[in-house]
Amino acid sequence: MRGGNLKVLVVYDITDDSLRLKVAEILKDLGLFRIQKSAFIGEMTSQERENMEEILRRQNLGPSDRIDVFPICDRDLKMHSQIGRGKFGRGPP
């Protein structure tokens, strides 16, 4: 993960394929790593997180679409468990 002071987990449920792909590209461009089909994790400053949230707010989400951004502390991240060997990995620690 990039240098910074805040780890974030972003998960989303978006019905429109093109918008879902666009959100994934935005998150990748911001330096987050995909850990599931609709979940990304990364490290960023508070300002970068605010900027990311503003960019995501500007997307034309449908009435049932949702994006959640969770701050995660190092202690909680270290307690992470991965069960199975799905297509996506955890990304850099």
From Swiss-Prot:
One of its GO terms (biological process) is maintenance of CRISPR repeat elements. Its EC number is 3.1.-.-. GO terms for molecular function: metal ion binding; RNA endonuclease activity. Its cofactor is Mg(2+). The keyword Nucleotide-binding does not apply. Mg(2+) binds at residue 13. It is an enzyme of class 3 (hydrolase). The keyword Nucleotide-binding does not apply. It holds the Pfam family CRISPR_Cas2. Homodimer, forms a heterotetramer with a Cas1 homodimer. CRISPR (clustered regularly interspaced short palindromic repeat), is an adaptive immune system that provides protection against mobile genetic elements (viruses, transposable elements and conjugative plasmids). CRISPR clusters contain sequences complementary to antecedent mobile elements and target invading nucleic acids. CRISPR clusters are transcribed and processed into CRISPR RNA (crRNA). Functions as a ssRNA-specific endoribonuclease. Involved in the integration of spacer DNA into the CRISPR cassette. This is CRISPR-associated endoribonuclease Cas2. It comes from Korarchaeum cryptofilum (strain OPF8).
